Amino acid sequence: DSFYAVMKFFTILYELSRCEGARSLSSSPFARVETHSDSRRIQMIQQYINQNYKQDIRLGVVSQMAGMSPVAFSRFFKTRTGKSLSEYIIDVRLGYAANLLIDTNNTVADICYDCGFNNLSNFNRIFKKKKNCSPKEFRENFRRKKKII
C-alpha cells in the first residue's frame, strides 16, 4: 500500500516536471544551497550578503573584507560565481522577497523595503524581469496553484 503511494507521488512529480507552463517559484540563491566554491573569500562574502541583504551592501566594503581592490574583487567574484556582485545581491533579495510573498500577507511595498530594495518601482521592474511576472501576479499564481494541489 505504501509502495503504491510512493509510486503515485513520483508519477505526480514526473507529470509536474513535464508541464508546459511550469515556472520556478524560487531562485537558487534563496535555496541557500551550500556553495560549491572552495574559496573561503567567496563563502565569507556570500554569508555576509545573506546576513545583511536588508542593508545597503557596497562593493568597497565587501572587497575590503576580502582583502582585495574593488576591481580585482569584482573580477574574482564574477569568475567564481558567474554573476556580478550586484546581480548576486539582487538574486538573494528576490529570493527572500519571493518567500515573503508566499508566506506572508505583507504588502508588496513592505516586502520590497524589507528585502533591501529602496525603490518600489525598481523592485517591481527587476522582479518582473527575473520572474516573468509582477510580485502581485507571483503571489496570486502561487496561491491559485496551492489551492489546486
Task: Put a short name on every predicted segment.
Residues 1-37:
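An amphipathic alpha-helical interaction segment
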Residues 6, 39-42, 59:
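Short, structured helix-loop boundary elements
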Residues 28-36, 48-94, 112-141:
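Basic/polar phosphate-binding segments, predominantly the helix-turn-helix DNA-binding elements
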Residues 56, 105-106:
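Residue at a beta-strand N-cap/secondary-structure junction
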